Amino acid sequence: NNKAGKKTHPQTVEMTPESRIIVISGPNAGGKSITLKTVGLLQLMLQSGLPVPVNERSRMCFFDSILSDIGDNQSIENHLSTYSFRLKQMQYFLKKCSKQTLFLIDEFGTGSDPELGGALSETFLEVFYSREAFGIITCLRKGNWLGFSNN
């Protein structure tokens, strides 16, 4: 970026056994999805044996599985609305999720009625948390998930 005259915006993301799940909330166009995708890309690069452009003091680990739900994946051919697709994704996540899992979910709870979406999201989050999985979730608002939050 320096050679191209562009500014680099470093990000700090820290997950520990005590703080395994990060919820990034904020307005549209605030950088939530970019942060989520950056973490996912860097993790895939590491696990593929590629050099990872991070600070020399950074520490990363390997996961047995990386699960992602990023983007609107509705399908006319498969008769799936955004809501139906998301439920199928979460069903798959629940089957695969363990303490060796990194999950990345963009706009958690969207595609449904806000009240129902919030309740379902909270239920899925409880399972991910109980299985000691690591993850990052983006959303427009945190909803009732603050009980899982350290701060």
Whereabouts are the PLM-identified features?
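ATPase nucleotide-binding head domains, primarily ABC-like/P-loop NTPase cores
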Residues: N1-N151
